C-alpha cells in the first residue's frame, strides 16, 4: 500500500500543513511519497525529503505547475494515481481546489476534511458545523482525501532521507492562468499556526477597539483573529476570520473576546487546547465550550488583562 501526499508550498518553503498530512498518512500505513509541483521548487523538494516517514519525493518541475493551478496539477496526479491506494492533500485552499478535480478525473468519491483515521478504508470527518462526527468508509480502489491539519500532530520536519525523482509534468491546459497575489504581511504569527490566538467579535463594537487585543497579542506573541460578525461589520479584514467559512485554528490557547459563540465560529476553534472566553452575557454559547470564562465588560477586563501581563 502506497500513499501520495500533495505538498502545500509557496515555491520556497514547505507549508506546515504538509507535515500534518504526512502524519495522517502515517496512521493509514504504507509507503509515503510526496508530490512537489512547481518549476522552482528545489528547496521545497529537499525539505520534503527530510520529513520523517517520507520514502520518496516526486517533483513535477514545470512552469505550468506554479501557483497550484488546479487544472494543470490535477491531471499530473491523475497520471500517478494508479500506483497508489490513497491520495492525500491538506484541506487548505490549494488542496480543496485540486483534489475534487482529481476525484472527478478518476470518477471516485472524495472524503473531505478528515480529523481521524479509523483504518485504511475508514475515516472520521466533522459535519453540521462540527456538531456531529461522521464515520465514512470507502471501497474505492483509490481514496481521495483532504486532511484537516489541526487534527493531526505534525511529524518531524527533519530526520528523513527520501529519494527525489522527477515525474512528467504535463502541459498547460490553458483553462486558467495566474494573475497576481496580494499577500498581507504581519510581524505576528500566522493565524493558523500560532500557539496563542486572541479573537474579537461583534462585542468589540468598532474596528479601532481591536487595538486593545493587539496590545495583548504583542505581549503574548499571539495572532489576532475575529468572528464572522466582526468581519462582516467591517471591523477587521477577511483574513482575520476564524470559523466554518474562515480559518480553522487549534492553538494551545484561544482567547475569545466579545464573541457570543455561534456554531459557525465554534467549528473553527473548538479543538483549541485551552479556551478562555470574556463576555458580559453569562448565557453566551461560548461559555459552553470554554475552559475558563469571565463574565465582564471587555472594555474593562481587556485593559486590566493587558496591564497584568
Regions found by a protein language model. Name each.
Residues 1-309:
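N-terminal glycine-rich FAD/FM-binding segment characteristic of electron-transfer flavoproteins
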